[in-house]
């Protein structure tokens, strides 16, 4: 995969995508937007324009990168890193038939990699390329902003090779990923899920700050590192071609950093030019083309490892023939289907890919073949989409789909509860005063609203006290600095059963009421106001007091 010759002082593995932090001004965003007085911030954006010079038809001999041929594995592997790659291709039998496909539907099962995901390939490739370039040396520290799977791959390789590993990941990522990372010896830093990628508080921003503070540390940077798509160009794509004897008519892959679909697609365009490349992007992400596909009211999504709010440098959208958007609901439904009907223990993003595959492959005929990439394992999501409770709480599963006998109160509405007048706090109130107010009123939490009543977030005693003790805030700081935004909302018309599912995982739920607001000639807008805060104790009190009347 040809690329410009690396320049002196460039990033890991001599990658032409990576101009060093002291290099091109185009890669530097030294101060947060609109704040010229802020301290200088040194980082490299994950969406800088690509400098890769790969062209269809250009000889691989012109490439500055090292390309190794696929090798047969020995009977006894020298270490677990040799079990990365050579993943099986499995025929999907029932799902394709049930959705009326005429073509053959095959799954490339990347969860058979040593660390459980397709990201093991790029993790090992980035490290080995950096070692060959002399960038990464014994005793150095690897830092990486990641949704979890790349982190697991890097932590696995770091454990075997002896590097210190620090993984920076958003809060929405599953606890299972965190537990696996800790078991592998990685240090973990969590960042707010809703932080924009270019914010200093994002997983990207925090990783670059740590790099400035820790000597001999490196961000291999999957978003810009040419080793990312190269891993798939040299191995994943070659395996697919060998397993299919060079015959495939469509490839479907979801996109996160874009390295998987870019690397595979470039090789297939060279060796199997008639193969259609189908990209999968979740609703709420902006990777798909044309841009109209990305227009949605969805601002967040639960499926992990795919989609972004920026276009990563390594994503080459010119090699994708068509994009499809996927929803959380269909992603998790298809992931469960793959497990239940095909015995494939895959993750949610695999469900996204297969949901799109059964749509895109409708045009294929008998004798044609569609290959879909299943990126990771269900291991990382045992407490998420594998759980009926989680699926019900998120609205991805209906009560009617579960044949379980429910208690007498299950279908009653939240409005049946005796909710007290809500206590709210303005964002300018200090942490010290807020603690006094909550303790004085006997509350553990309160909504933070602005002057118009719009909900900004929640503040909890536990969150405030831990932030104060950790030195993140001072007692005199405004409470808006410790807003808690990972809370659940429920409406008065929702059932107590739905509330029960929330309270099994959370200490409270915010009861909200929707209003339609008109502002003169402007279009009406929906806004939410606080009706109350409900806790498990409120529900238990209601059940106990009304239960006697039911007997």
UniProtKB/Swiss-Prot annotation:
GO terms for molecular function: cystathionine beta-synthase activity; metal ion binding; protein homodimerization activity; pyridoxal phosphate binding. It catalyses: L-homocysteine + L-serine = L,L-cystathionine + H2O. The keyword Metal-binding applies. Signal peptide: none annotated. GO terms for cellular component: cytoplasm; nucleus. The keyword Cell cycle does not apply. It is found in: Cytoplasm; Nucleus. Residues 418-476 form the CBS domain. Allosterically activated by S-adenosyl-methionine/AdoMet. Activated by S-adenosylhomocysteine/AdoHcy. Binds non-covalently to a heme group that may control the redox sensitivity of the enzyme. Residues 1-41 are annotated as: Disordered. The modification N6-(pyridoxal phosphate)lysine is found at residue 119. SUPFAM superfamilies: CBS-domain pair, Tryptophan synthase beta subunit-like PLP-dependent enzymes. PROSITE patterns: CBS, CYS_SYNTHASE. Its cofactor is pyridoxal 5'-phosphate. It is an enzyme of class 4 (lyase). Its EC number is 4.2.1.22. Keywords: Amino-acid biosynthesis, CBS domain, Cysteine biosynthesis, Cytoplasm, Heme, Iron, Isopeptide bond, Lyase, Metal-binding, Nucleus, Phosphoprotein, Pyridoxal phosphate, Ubl conjugation. GO terms for biological process: cysteine biosynthetic process from serine; cysteine biosynthetic process via cystathionine; homocysteine catabolic process; homocysteine metabolic process; hydrogen sulfide biosynthetic process; L-serine metabolic process. Pyridoxal 5'-phosphate binds at residues 149, 256-260, 349. There is a cross-link at residue 211 (Glycyl lysine isopeptide (Lys-Gly) (interchain with G-Cter in SUMO)). SMART domains: CBS. Belongs to the cysteine synthase/cystathionine beta-synthase family. Hydro-lyase catalyzing the first step of the transsulfuration pathway, where the hydroxyl group of L-serine is displaced by L-homocysteine in a beta-replacement reaction to form L-cystathionine, the precursor of L-cysteine. This catabolic route allows the elimination of L-methionine and the toxic metabolite L-homocysteine. Also involved in the production of hydrogen sulfide, a gasotransmitter with signaling and cytoprotective effects on neurons. PANTHER family: CYSTATHIONINE BETA-SYNTHASE (PTHR10314). This is Cystathionine beta-synthase.
């Amino acid at each position: 995969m040809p690329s410009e010759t690396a320049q002196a002082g460039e990033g890991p593995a001599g990658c032409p995508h990576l101009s060093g932090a002291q290099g091109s001004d185009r890669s530097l965003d030294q101060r947060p937007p609109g704040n010229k007085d802020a301290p200088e911030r040194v980082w490299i954006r994950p969406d800088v324009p690509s400098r890769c010079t790969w062209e269809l038809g250009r000889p691989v001999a012109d490439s500055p990168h090292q390309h190794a041929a696929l090798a047969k594995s020995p009977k006894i592997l020298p270490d677990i890193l040799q079990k990365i790659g050579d993943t099986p291709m499995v025929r999907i039998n029932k799902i394709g038939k049930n959705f009326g496909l005429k073509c053959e539907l095959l799954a490339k099962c990347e969860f058979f990699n040593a660390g459980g995901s397709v990201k093991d390939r790029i993790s090992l490739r980035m490290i080995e390329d950096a070692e060959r370039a002399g960038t990464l040396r014994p005793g150095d520290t690897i830092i990486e902003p990641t949704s979890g799977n790349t982190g697991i791959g890097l932590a696995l390789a770091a454990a075997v090779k002896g590097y210190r590993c620090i993984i920076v990941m958003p809060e929405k990522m599953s606890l299972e990923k965190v537990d696996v990372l800790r078991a592998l010896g990685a240090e973990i830093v969590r960042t707010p899920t809703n932080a924009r990628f270019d914010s200093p508080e994002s997983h990207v921003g925090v990783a670059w700050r740590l790099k400035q503070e820790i000597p001999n540390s490196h961000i291999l940077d999957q978003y810009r590192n040419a080793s990312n798509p190269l891993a798939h160009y040299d191995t994943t794509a070659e395996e697919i071609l060998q397993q299919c004897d060079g015959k495939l008519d469509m490839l479907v892959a979801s996109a996160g950093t874009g390295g998987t679909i870019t690397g595979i697609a470039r090789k297939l365009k060279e060796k199997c030019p008639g193969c259609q490349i189908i990209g999968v992007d979740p609703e709420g992400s902006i990777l798909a083309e044309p841009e109209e596909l990305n227009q949605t009211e969805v601002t967040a999504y639960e499926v992990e490892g795919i989609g972004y709010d920026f276009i990563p440098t390594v994503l080459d959208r010119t090699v994708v023939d068509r994009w499809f958007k996927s929803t959380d609901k269909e992603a998790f439904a298809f992931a469960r289907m793959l497990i239940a009907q095909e015995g494939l223990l895959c993750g949610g993003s695999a469900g996204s890919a297969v949901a799109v595959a059964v749509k895109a492959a409708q045009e294929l005929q008998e004798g044609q073949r569609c290959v879909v990439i299943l990126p990771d394992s269900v291991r990382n999501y045992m407490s998420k989409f594998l759980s009926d409770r989680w699926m019900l709480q998120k609205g991805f599963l209906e009560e009617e789909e579960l044949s379980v006998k429910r208690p007498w109160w299950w279908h009653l509405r939240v409005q049946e509860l005796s909710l007290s007048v809500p206590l709210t706090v303005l964002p300018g109130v200090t942490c010290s005063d807020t603690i006094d107010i909550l303790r004085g009123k006997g509350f553990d939490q309160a909504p933070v609203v602005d002057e118009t009543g719009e909900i900004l977030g929640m503040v909890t005693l536990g969150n405030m006290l831990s932030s104060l003790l950790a030195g993140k805030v001072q007692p005199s700081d405004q409470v808006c600095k410790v807003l808690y935004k990972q809370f659940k909302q429920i409406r008065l018309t929702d059932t107590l059963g739905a509330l029960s599912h929330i309270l099994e995982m959370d200490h409270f739920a915010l009861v909200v009421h929707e209003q339609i607001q008109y502002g003169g000639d402007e279009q009406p807008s929906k806004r939410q106001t606080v009706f109350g805060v409900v806790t498990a104790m409120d529900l238990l009190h209601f059940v106990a007091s009304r239960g006697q009347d039911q007997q």
